[in-house]
Amino acid sequence: MDYRRLGRTDVQVSEIGFGGAPAGLRNYLGAWEPESDDAAERIVQTVRRAIARGINYFDTAPGYGGGRGEELLGLGLRGQREKVIIATKVTGDDADAVRRSVERSLTLLGTDTIDLLQYHGGWYSAEDVDKILRPGGALAGMQAARDEGLVRHLGFTAEGPNGFASQLLATGAFDVLQICHNVIFQHPYDPSRHAGIIYDAAAQDMGVVAMRPMTSGTFQRWLGMVAPQVQEAVDWHRATLAFVLSNPLLSVAIAGMRTPEEVDANIAAAEDRLMRVDLDLLHTRYV
């Protein structure tokens, strides 16, 4: 497993991270019942396999099954806390809501400190930015939790780049950006112009986390519809992950995993360096 620097946090993170959404959400990316005893056993086994294989970055959120995703991850991390980086998230309109969310996450995860607390956003609006940045807003609550030692670093997630996400970035208050970035959704990182929100984050020495690096299967399904012969000719699981890991500004790509076999498959894909590409050269030739 290769490790990369998570921006100015100076934390070394595995270039593949454990994405917790599929663990906590019912029937997300396939049949799954997160409340079952079987789910708990499988997630514990999966988390332990991930740690044994060198994965140290674990991402989850209260919104993944109303806290079930955090609870399952906490079960898997028992006795392993010192080996991992835990990243979870908050929503809420004010500092008090953030505080309540952090306290619940700490309990469910079975830890006394969260390594990275991220505001859980999507496509930001002016209203979203206001409730985060206003006095007594969500950011104030996140900073208070950090100052108290309940969390170590702050970040925010975004489905995509827009002017409002850039406003959050421009505050300089966040250490890490998590953004959707993959072979379909490339515009957060444009090597042809050296532009995009990933470049902006790197200019602040922020860590950059890619969500949905393998497009949640969308790219593969599209290929199956329009060019099935191409879909069958290439291991697109490996190819899509390799595309994202080729980004030199990326810290970690998080992939959902619910079985030890999925852990092994994701690590094998990451280790296949023959599929890595020079993104600058790629865009110079074809853009």
Predicted regions and their residues:
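Active-site groove signature of glycoside hydrolases
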Residues: L106-V129
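N-terminal binding-site loop/beta-alpha segment at the start of enzyme catalytic domains
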Residues: M1-V84
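Active-site mouth loops of central-metabolism enzymes
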Residues: A23-E41, A87-A97, G224-V234
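Short, acidic/polar
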Residues: E33-A50, A95-G110, G160-L169, W236-F243
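Acidic-and-aromatic substrate-binding clefts and catalytic sites of carbohydrate-active enzymes
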Residues: A61-E70, T91-V98, Y124-A126, N162, ...
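Conserved, mostly hydrophobic/aromatic
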Residues: L6, F18, A50, F58, ...
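Beta/alpha (TIM)-barrel catalytic core signal, keyed to glycine-rich beta->alpha loops juxtaposed to Asp/Glu
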Residues: Y3, A40, G121-V287
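Acidic (Asp/Glu)-rich catalytic clusters
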Residues: R8-D10, A52, G74-E82, E103-D112, ...
